[in-house]
Amino acid sequence: MRQHIGRHILGAVLAILILASLCGCGMGTGAGADPTPAATTPEPTPTLSPEEEAAQQERQARLAAQKDGYLLDKGYLYAVDETGELRSNTYVGVLYFREDGRYTSGSEDLDRMVAGAIRKSTDEKMTRMDMLRAMYEYTRDHIKYVGFGNHEDSYKAAHGKDGWMVESATYALENGTGNCYHFAATFAALARGVGFQAYAASGLIGSEDQEHGWVEIVDDSGEVWYSDPETEYARSYWMNQKYDLFYKSKDEIGSVTGIGYLELTDPFEAERKEAEAEGRPLPSPAPKT
């Protein structure tokens, strides 16, 4: 009986050894062993959707083609230097571009609303001046005049003080109402959003020195251009007079409206004070004649 069991055990062991030698997976590292580990299937690399990939390629192509200028992406403004690289952590005139290259007013809420207005009102076929005109008309048509509006903002603006543009533009875009200072602040914010050196100015107009707010834009040559969306709105709405007060010289806007414009403060100096108070880098002055 024992001999019978022993023969069965011996046969089983021999069978295992034979199978091991045939399949090359012998015990130990003999000639039949394969020291190379079995290949593993790599994890699939996440892929963009066709729409995301197309959008990414389009942005890259636009960046490569754009030199020393501005680029809009989903309503947000970026600046590109002469080599095609994004400007970041720097000012271009009064426009500040943060670490990721995106322009910011210093307020995420205002940036979001400005980008939304740009997306609604512009397209890539427009020239920058077309976009500026669209922002002017957006301001004129989307704010309803309600007298003094936000009194604190109005007081600061009317008395030639600084620090009111962001606050007043945010109020007007959120509520759709405001006075001349809110119109001015909103257009200045939107104009900056499409890459213009725009300032919300406050001062006195007319022979009676009436307090008023308007916008001044400094072009690349240093010339100053005036825009007054609130006066255009008011004369159209209440007096049925059709004026075009977009991007005029000081003489032109005075001859059209019959009023003169006198600044109480230099808008650029107000910008410097605001940046200094908040601990931000000081903007470099845009040339101004």
For the regions a language model picked out, list residue spans one by one:
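Active-site nucleophilic cysteine motif
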Residues: 131, 135, 176-191
